[in-house]
Amino acid sequence: MANDARPLARLANCRVGDQSSATHAYTVGPVLGVPPTGGVDLRYGGRAGIGRSETVTDHGAVGRRYHQPCAGQIRLSELRVTILLRCETLCETAQLLRCPPLPCDCSTPL
């Protein structure tokens, strides 16, 4: 079932602060201690930390940075991942999830 094709899920409610129409950088990393599933559990990190979860489908790779419009669609690999919004929250969210340290590279404009 690793290659099971499913319809894309739209990233909803991904507004961060007043950036209602901005393009955000999504950095994908694994959530430790959770086995792979048929879907992907998305945890949105923002100014308030970790938010709600939604399920999307496969394609892509852990560690890849995605640049998509906030209301756009995104494909991810079939495992539990974390979507982190806003570069400045990347390391803080990773610590909350007890993930390995992640590089906080803000050289790419959001």
From Swiss-Prot:
Disruption phenotype: Deletion mutant shows increased production of SMK.
Name of the protein in question: Uncharacterized protein Rv2269c
Function: May play a regulatory role in sulfomenaquinone (SMK) biosynthesis. Not essential for SMK biosynthesis.
Entry's induction text: Part of an operon that includes stf3 and cyp128, which are required for the production of SMK.
GO biological process annotation, one example: symbiont-mediated evasion of host immune response
Domain of life: Bacteria
